[in-house]
Amino acid sequence: MSAAIHRRAKNFRWEGVDVLPYKEDARALFKGVTRQVLFRNPEQESELRYFEVAPGGFSTLERHRHTHSVLILRGRGCCLVGRDVRQLDTNDLVAVPPMTWHQFRAAEGEPLGFLCMVNSTRDKPQLPSAEDLAALEGDPAVAAFLRGAW
């Protein structure tokens, strides 16, 4: 992005901002997610990204050392942060601490769009092992969330 102003196009798209694949790791399980990098400035040492999860879709269940700061811009859904399952609506804020399992899911009838700020330099996400999943699924609310029954 070289221009100082990128005009809003339609449906949460911006002129001159590419819609990118969500992940490039074939092992990461997700459904119906796109990513746009809105700001990447080395002097700020952060990136502001827009993710959109299609109706009924979900992001990868993952954890990492860096934090996420999330603002829901569009739609409704649910998120898992640690063992906390919460409903999401427009303008809700979600803070994801380091090394915390997290995932976002869109409601069936509408997309879930959110801004996510992260450090420019960050570690790669870790996917859960079978043991990690078993531990998470020991909590009935988390197990229901992971099955998509929230």
Where do the protein language model's features map onto the residues?
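Short acidic-glycine-tyrosine-enriched beta hairpin
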Residues: 83-98
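Glycine- and acidic-residue-biased ligand/ion/polar-headgroup-sensing regions
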Residues: 66-68, 72-77
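Conserved short histidine dyad/triad with adjacent acidic residue
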Residues: 49-64
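A short, N-terminal "cap"/entry segment at the start of jelly-roll beta-barrel domains
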Residues: 1-45, 131-150
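Short beta-strand His + acidic residue motifs that chelate non-heme Fe in jelly-roll/DSBH
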Residues: 59-61, 79-80, 96, 102-108, ...
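A generic "binding-loop/recognition-motif" signal
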Residues: 57, 65-66, 84, 100-101, ...
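A short hydrophobic beta-strand segment most commonly corresponding to one strand
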Residues: 50, 95, 110-127
